[in-house]
Amino acid sequence: MVKLLKVARLQFLIVGLSLYVLGALVAVVLGAPFSLGRLLVGYLVILPAQLSVHFSNDYFDVAYDRPGGPTLISGGGGVLLEHPELREPVKWIAIGLILFSIAVGIFFIRIYAFPWWIMGFVVLGNLVGWCYSAPPFRLSQRGLGELCYTFAAGFLVPAMGYLTMRGALDTGGMFFLVPLILYGLVSILSVEIPDMEDDRLGNKRTWVAVRGRGFGFMVIGWLLLAVTGYFFFFHRFYPRQLPLDFRIVGYLSLLPLLPGLLGMIKKPAEKQPAAKIATWIVITLAVFSIFVDGYLLYLASRLL
């Protein structure tokens, strides 16, 4: 059981939860009624889907894991290298989690009378997570892994949170999803930076494996600058008044921007210093999301 929990990488669930809650709180702040039941049942769609990705990635990528290779933010868990007898159970756990996610999605739509097109999001999210590393698709080896991760983590997860409260994805929701999509791309590029050598050995055509760590840090830096600029300036062009102070969110976005700019300036080529900066970028992205959740929760509590 302990070994399977290591494969699950429970620490990464915090990011998924915070993004889901962020989407839900944005909907409430924009006027949607709050429902604890919808919030909890909706998360039972997201949680198994995210866990399934952790299990399926370890199962299909075991050939590319290296003993001692994993870092805090990247690399396989290493469990299946040491315990190959767990490979089949891990595969079936991943499949079972997908089926559970879809079943809860159907239950959610039936009990809360939501439109059935939302099931398209649920099925698509699970399909993308499976195809990320599973043959014959193996999107992570075809230069498509970044787009898949960005779509799933940066768009689908917070969008599902928004949908559970509002029941539709409107202009207000999309306005908030744009920076989260960019942050999703920052996150996956940061995770790829420590894995560059192993990905090249495994013929994974990740953007960092193909173009190098310097390229990864440059893209990350520009994306983080774009998000901070978005929070400080772009909201002025939104057609109606929004009930929050974007300067606060902009200041919070400086948390991931600072290590991002450090990586952009230094562009370390060696694994150890590069992994250190990439780790800080991922950690500060998570902290940013949690702090924004706190701010939105404060605003929502004043509206309830």
Give the positions of each predicted feature.
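Functional transmembrane core segments of multi-pass inner-membrane proteins
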Residues: V29, P33, Y149-R200, G214, ...
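Small-residue-rich segments of transmembrane alpha-helices in multi-pass membrane proteins
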Residues: L17-G23, L147-Y162, V208-R213, I277-F291
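Intramembrane alpha-helical segments
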Residues: V2, G77-A168
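Multi-pass membrane catalytic core of lipid/isoprenoid biosynthesis enzymes
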Residues: G68-A113, R205-R240, T284
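Acidic (Asp/Glu-rich) catalytic motifs at the cytosolic membrane interface
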Residues: P48-S74, L185-V208
